[in-house]
């Protein structure tokens, strides 16, 4: 079943950081709390995943396939997003099969795991790397390791806009 684009647009609070030494220097600092976006899809992960989810939905894909290690925050966020929004996820993992808190979560969230070994994982930069995976999972859209790439780079603009909104809320503005 094709991905249905989620209508989920979390916001992150901008929290002023009040320290005496900053006040003496007349410096105002605030921290954009991306860790508070969501307990599982937090930090920069949502901003990197969202454009890939949107592209997969536009292409009529049923889900996403991506790469990472046995402790990958990217795969963890991807699996959590798949579970929350109801799309298929497949993880291609570096190394030999191992059980970690992350891999247990990935499986609990419904991600299918394939262990590539170390040599197989090094092949990810080859031009033909995705070919056998596209044949095996034609309904899935591939996502670069860590969610990187041009789509993710463009998503950082959303982070800037989020910061502007929060700064205006503090009365700072840009």
Feature annotation, model-predicted:
Residues 1-174:
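PLP-dependent amino-acid enzyme catalytic core
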């Amino acid at each position: 079943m094709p991905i249905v684009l989620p209508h989920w647009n979390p916001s992150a609070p901008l929290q002023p950081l009040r320290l005496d030494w900053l006040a003496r220097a007349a410096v105002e600092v605030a921290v954009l709390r991306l860790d508070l976006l969501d307990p599982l899809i937090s930090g920069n992960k949502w901003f990197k995943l969202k454009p890939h989810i949107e592209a997969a939905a536009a292409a009529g894909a049923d889900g996403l396939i991506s790469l990472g290690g046995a402790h990958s925050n990217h795969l963890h966020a991807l699996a959590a997003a798949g579970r929350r929004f109801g799309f298929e996820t497949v993880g291609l993992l570096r190394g030999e099969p191992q059980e970690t808190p992350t891999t247990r979560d990935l499986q609990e969230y419904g991600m299918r795991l394939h262990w590539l070994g170390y040599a197989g994982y090094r092949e990810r930069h080859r031009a033909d790397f995705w070919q056998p995976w596209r044949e095996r999972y034609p309904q899935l859209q591939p996502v670069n390791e860590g969610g990187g790439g041009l789509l993710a780079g463009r998503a950082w603009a959303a982070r800037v806009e989020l910061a502007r909104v929060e700064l205006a809320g503090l009365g700072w503005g840009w």
